[in-house]
Structure formats: C-alpha cells, structure tokens
Amino acid sequence: MIRLNWKLNLISEIESSLTKPPVDLLNSEKKNFLRIKTSGEIDYDKQIYLYNLNEDGKPGFEVINPITINTKNYLLNRGWITFDKKNSLEINNLDEQNIIGVLKKQNKANIFKPKNDIEKNYWFTLNRDDVFSYTGKNFSEYIIYLDGNYQTPKPKKIDANISNNHKKYALTWFSLAISILLLYLYFRKKNY
C-alpha cells in the first residue's frame, strides 16, 4: 500500500507539472516532465528518424533534431511523421526562437530492438553511442518533447500515463494471504 500511495503521488506531481506554465530552460532545475520554453539553433542536417507508432498504431518516424541552447546540446523530439515525409523539406519549418516543450529523461535502450541503421538514418533507439557517432556531439540526458499544435511533424502528447499496477498487486497479495489463512484454518480444524 505504501508503494501504491507513492505511485499515486508521483502521478499527481507529474500531472501538476504538466499543467504549469512553461519555465525558462536556462534558469530552471532540470527535472522529468518539466514544461519549458527556450530558443536555440536546430541542426536539420543531423535530423534523426526514430521508428515508432503513432497514437493510432500506424508506423512512421519521430523526427528528432539536435538543438544547441546556450552551448548545451539537447535532442528535440519534434513529433511523428509518415514514412513518405522522411527527408521532406516541409518538415523543417520550426521557429527556433519560440520553442515550448516538456523535458523528459531519455529512456534506456531496449535490448530486444534491432540495431540502428545510421547510414540510412533509420533508428530504433536513441543509443547514446550511436547518436554521438552520427552527430559528433554529446547530449543532455533529457530530451525536449515539442509541445504545440503542429501538423507535420505532429508532436507526441506527453502525459502522466505511467504504469500503475499497485492496486492489482495489493489485491493479489491480500487475496493470496487470505486464501492461505483459510486453508491453514481448514486443515488445522480437520486435524484437531
């Protein structure tokens, strides 16, 4: 039950953070799910196409660009596109002076995903070594997820939808404990 309360508090904190006005990235403590505003220099030449499904389960790419903000390098996840939009100039139209987004810590690479094909710019994970090999730069552990009403690429919606199975776990363990207690009482009564 303690972990359930901890998880509910964590979800509440994330929801609260996502509804607050954005803060200046340079003048704030970096933390997960922080809404930020910033400006920087986007590198369209080293754009990364990360294979992913959209909200409807359709395959495509998330467009990720290196962005330099006051000498610090970040990855900017601009959103999802269909396969046919890859390398289209139409997707390189972001105003570099008014970026609003959400900071999120980079997930660890899944060992079951295929290797990135850096030469064809076809990515399955944002493996830090591969990203360095491709861009020649080291990046913050936080990714900026673009926020806004853009059509192409369509920004990924970041919300507090994190796994919370603690109620199920508690119910399972309490049910198991009660079952064992009832079996114990049944056999104890039978033997006396």
Predicted regions mapped to residue ranges:
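Surface-exposed, charge/polar-rich loops and edge strands
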Residues: I2-N27, L34-Y192
